[in-house]
Amino acid sequence: MADHKGTDNIDHNDVLDGSWCLITEAECEDDTLVDLFEESTNDSVVSNLLDDSESIIQGNSEESDRCIQELKRKLNVTPEKQISELSPRLSAVHITPERASKRRLFNDSGVVEDEAESNTIQVDSLLVQKDAGNQNGAECELNSILRSNNIRATVLCKFKDKFGVSFNELTRSFKSDKTCTPNWVITAIGIREDLRDACKVLLQQHVEFLEMICNDFSVLLLVEFKVTKNRETVLKLMCSMLNAKEEQILCEPPKLKSTAAALYFYKKIITDTCFKYGTLPSWVSRLTIVEHQLASADTFSLSEMVQWAYDNDFTEEASVAYNYACYATENTNAAAFLASNMQVKYVKDCVAMVRMYKRQEMKSMTMSEWISKCCKEETIGEEWKEIVQFLKYQGVNFLEFLIALKQFFKCTPKKMCIVIYGPPDTGKSMFCFKLVQFLKGQVVSYINKSSQFWLMPLQDAKIGLLDDATHNCWIYLDTYLRNAFDGNTFCLDIKHKNLQQTKLPPMIITTNVNVTTDESLFYLRSRLTCFNFPNKLPMSDKDEPLFTISDKSWTCFFRKFWNQLELQEDAARDPGEPEHPFCCTARNSVDFD
C-alpha cells in the first residue's frame, strides 16, 4: 500500500511527551498575595527605597563603614580640569549638537545618580603662588596703612620703628597747607626700591640739598628746595615721583632751632649711612659745626634792621620788635638782635630812623606823586560812581566839588581847607575819613586842646582831618590859625624839640555848625570852602550804609578824574615811585625773603 502524503500521524502520547515541541504550562501554587508581590519586586530598580537598615546587626554596620572609609583614603581621584582653564576657545567646540535646555523647577531626586562620582575641580596652584608673590613688602606696608582706622598714627608708629626717633621730634607743625618754606622733612612708608632710587636723581633738579635715609621700604628725606614751597606743592611732587598716595607721606618743616634734630641728620651724613646731595643747610651747620657757630657770632647792624623796617613799611615799635624777632630764623642780623641785651634801644632807634626817612620821602614828593603812590592798584572799575552818587544825594554840585578839590590839592592860599557841615547822621565823617585813610593822612582832635602839642601830628602828613569841630573849636581856629589857613608858614611846637617852622597841610573839617551864617566867624569864613550835607545817610535793614565808599572807590575816582584835577606824574618812571630805591645799607648784606 502506498505511503500517505502529508505529515505523518503522530501519536497523541508523543505530543504530550514533548518530543516534537515544548509546551510550558503555568505552575500554580497556593501562594499568598504578599508572597507574589515580594517575588515580583526582587529584580526591580527601585528596590531598597524603604530603609530597613534597622534590621541589620549594628556590629556589621560599623565594620562596613570602617572598610569603606579605609578604601576612600586609598582612592586618589584625578581632579577634572575645567575646559575654560585648558583653552578659552576649546569650550566652544562640540561634537554632539546642542540641545535645548529643559526647564526644571527642582533637581533630580537622585535615585539613579551615582553618589560616588567625584565632582572635584583642580585648582591652579600656579595662580595662587602668583598672587602671593605680588604681595611684596611695599604693598604689605601700604595695605596695613590703608586698613587702619587712624592712618596718621599708624604712619608715625611705623616711622618710629623704622628710624628709631619720633617724627614730631624732628619737625614742627604747620597748621595751614599754604604756608611756604624752603626746608622740609618728608617721610614715605611702603615705597618700592626702584622708585626710591629714581627719586634720588629726579629731586636734584628741584633742591639745593637732599639727604635720603632708607630703611626697608620706608624713606626719610631732608630737603632744602631752591624756591619756597607749601605742603600741597610738596605732596604733589612726591606723590608723582614715588607713585604713592598722600596717606603714605608725612611732610612737615624741620625744627630749625633744635640741636637734637640737626645732630640726627648730621650724624647720618658723617657716618655715611645715607645718600647726600648738595651743601649742608645753614640751620644744620649753625647748630652742629663749631666753626660755623663761631663765624655766626656776627655783631648786630642797626642799618640792616632799619632797611628791613623801611622796606616792609613798619613804623610802629611793637610791629618792628615782633616781626624782626620772627625774622631771626632766616636772618643772621635778626638772630644777633635777639641775642643782644639792648633790644629796646635798637627798636626805638630803628623806628625813629624809619619815620625820618618816610617823612622826608613824603615831603620830597608832590601831591600828584603822593596820590599816585596811594593808587598802587591801577584798577579800572565803576566804583567811582558811589562817590558821585553820594554827592548828588547830598545836593552837592559835582563840578564845584572837583574845582574845590583841585585847589585843595594845589594848596592854593585860602582854598586849602574844605569844610563839610550839616546835621548829624548825614555821612560827613564817613566820607572824610575814607578819603584821609586812603591818602594816609593824620587826624587831630580838639579834645587835646589843653596840650600845646595837639597839632604836632600834622607835620608828618600830606593831608589832615579835624572831625566834629564845635563852636569853641572854631573860635580857637579863628583866633590862632588864620595865617595857617592862608598857606603861610607858622610856628609849631614839637615835643622835645625847638619850635618848628612849617606849613599847615590841606585840611578837611567836619562840623555841625553852619559857619556860612555865623557872624562870629566872619574873618575865618573867607578862608574856608564849605559844602552842606543836609540829608540823612540811608541805611539798609542790617543797619549798614547803602553808599559803600572804600579805598578802591577813591582809587577809581582819582584815575577817572586825573586830568580834571590837573594832577601830573612823571611818565619816565613808574607812578609814585622814586627815581632810585632808597638804600641805607649795602644790599648784598641783607637776606631777603
From Swiss-Prot:
The modification Phosphoserine is found at residue 87. HAMAP family: PPV_E1. A motif (Nuclear localization signal) lies at residues 72-74. ATP binds at residues 422-429. The keyword Flavoprotein does not apply. There is a cross-link at residue 503 (Glycyl lysine isopeptide (Lys-Gly) (interchain with G-Cter in SUMO)). Keywords: ATP-binding, DNA replication, DNA-binding, Early protein, Helicase, Host nucleus, Hydrolase, Isomerase, Isopeptide bond, Nucleotide-binding, Phosphoprotein, Ubl conjugation. Residues 134-297 are annotated as: DNA-binding region. The gene is E1. SUPFAM superfamilies: Origin of replication-binding domain, RBD-like, P-loop containing nucleoside triphosphate hydrolases. A motif (Nuclear export signal) lies at residues 86-95. GO terms for biological process: DNA replication. It comes from Human papillomavirus type 48. This is Replication protein E1. Coiled coil: none annotated. Gene3D superfamilies: 3.40.1310.10, P-loop containing nucleotide triphosphate hydrolases, Zinc finger, large T-antigen D1 domain. GO terms for cellular component: host cell nucleus. It is an enzyme of class 5 (isomerase). ATP-dependent DNA 3'-5' helicase required for initiation of viral DNA replication. It forms a complex with the viral E2 protein. The E1-E2 complex binds to the replication origin which contains binding sites for both proteins. During the initial step, a dimer of E1 interacts with a dimer of protein E2 leading to a complex that binds the viral origin of replication with high specificity. Then, a second dimer of E1 displaces the E2 dimer in an ATP-dependent manner to form the E1 tetramer. InterPro entries: Helicase_SF3_DNA-vir (IPR014015), P-loop_NTPase (IPR027417), PPV_DNA_helicase_E1_C (IPR001177), PPV_DNA_helicase_E1_N (IPR014000), PPV_E1_DBD (IPR046832), PPV_E1_DBD_sf (IPR046935), Rep_E1_papillomaV (IPR016393), Znf_lg_T-Ag_D1_dom_sf (IPR037102).
